Amino acid sequence: MRKRIIAAALAAAMMLAMPISAIAAKKPDEWSGLIELGQTNATQYEPLGIKNHGSYAWRDGSTIYISYALEIENTNKNLAVWFPHIEIAVVAEDGSVIKTDDEYLDWVAEDDSYWYAGYFTYEYDGTIPAGIEMAVSAQDYNYQPSAGKEVLRSGELAVTNTSKRGSGYETRFTGKVTNNSAYKTNAKVIVLYKMKDESGEEVPVCGDIDYVLDIQPGETKNFEIHPYSGLSNYSSWEIVAIQM
């Protein structure tokens, strides 16, 4: 399905302590900042949308880190969506594309939404990223009634007993995930890192993931997430779980 990407300046959803141009004036290893976002709207059915979002960028030596978080929303009352496709492009000030990344997820139930977050890296080539273009979509045939399919709603994987342990390279996030659905499932357990925007509201901007496999209906399993993203200057964190 073709998508039309519409660039949009960030307002209350994201915080920018200083313009990217001002950040670039600092020594290269020191720049960091929340950056712009564009969204995509599909044209058929009630298309998947991005309900909320956040992103962050920083440099460590010759490596650029791009982190992102988005709440994917399915407003269809009678159609679940299989294999939602997230596409991300990092763009320069002149509009040229520096780097792209994408991710396929599992089901989004009817009239439901959930958060997903992650990060990717690339080698710095002297061009400072000025913004992010973000899209979410699905193929026409992946809009399907959920009857007879093992589709979980966002609240059916319950995360409890969460804690942050250790420090430095030994930092880890632990807890339990319970499958409250009628189906055996695998889960992506995601720690969402949040930063405050200009209004003081905390917005997810990054995530690290653990995979918990073969969770039977009613079963609870432990998890441990290691912060491989390296993001450390977040204001708070939260852990969620989604079907995979």
Residue ranges with predicted function:
Residues 1-5, 9-10:
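Positively charged n-region of N-terminal signal peptides that target proteins for export
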Residues 10, 14-18:
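Hydrophobic core
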Residues 18-31:
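Sec-dependent signal peptide cleavage junction
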Residues 28-34, 122-164, 205, 229-244:
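Terminal connector regions
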Residues 62-70, 167-174:
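Short, solvent-exposed loop/turn segments enriched in Ser/Thr/Gly
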Residues 72-78, 177-183:
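Asparagine-centered strand-capping/turn motif at beta-strand->loop junctions
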Residues 79-86, 99-101, 185-191, 204-205:
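Short, hydrophobic/aromatic beta-strand segments
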Residues 97-126, 204-230:
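Intrinsically disordered, low-complexity Pro/Gly/Ser/Thr-rich segments with frequent PxxP/GP/PP motifs
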